[in-house]
């Protein structure tokens, strides 16, 4: 499994029936009942909730990394001449691309996506803590909020921090995803 940009995360591929140890001499897998009959999926989702928040946090950090890399690049990359009342002056030194309006727009969009995602992830993490350590009323309120926010905490950063990194690639001149 070679996911670009996702180094250091715990993920794996599961194959059922292709293993070294067949069941009763045939391809297959041994299954175990999780929870009560008909309730296993609910148990699995309960178990996976914190992992789903973790996936959203990983996407958030990738978006943050892309933003900070493109911000640093934009602060240092010269391109174009300053525009004055009489147009561009070729005799003047080049300006950094952070001074270009469209580059600035892309940087601000990246920052808003990444910081918005971070705020959501930190809020969900606080709710997880509240659910485990708060009094009964606070824990129940946190549980209810997490039921709604957990899928969002995974999907929203995954979608919008990818968009932030698409903008980061544009700020870098469209080089794409490269390794030095």
Predicted regions and their residues:
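Internal glycine-rich alpha/beta core junctions
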Residues: 1-180
């Amino acid at each position: 499994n070679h996911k670009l940009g996702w180094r250091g995360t715990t993920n794996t591929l599961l194959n059922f029936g292709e293993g070294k140890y067949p069941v009763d001499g045939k391809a297959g897998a041994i299954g175990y009942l999780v929870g009560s009959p008909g309730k296993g999926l609910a148990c699995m989702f309960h178990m996976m909730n914190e992992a789903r928040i973790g996936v959203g946090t990983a996407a958030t950090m990738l978006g943050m990394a892309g933003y900070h890399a493109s911000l640093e690049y934009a602060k240092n990359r010269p391109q174009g001449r300053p525009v004055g009342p009489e147009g561009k002056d070729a005799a003047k030194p080049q300006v950094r691309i952070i001074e270009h309006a469209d580059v600035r727009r892309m940087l601000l969009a990246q920052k808003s996506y990444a910081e918005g995602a971070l705020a959501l992830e930190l809020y969900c993490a606080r709710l997880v803590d509240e659910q485990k350590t708060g009094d009964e009323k606070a824990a129940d309120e946190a549980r209810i909020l997490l039921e709604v926010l957990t899928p969002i905490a995974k999907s929203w950063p995954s979608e919008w921090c990818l968009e932030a990194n698409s903008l980061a690639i544009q700020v870098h001149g469209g080089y794409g995803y490269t390794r030095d």
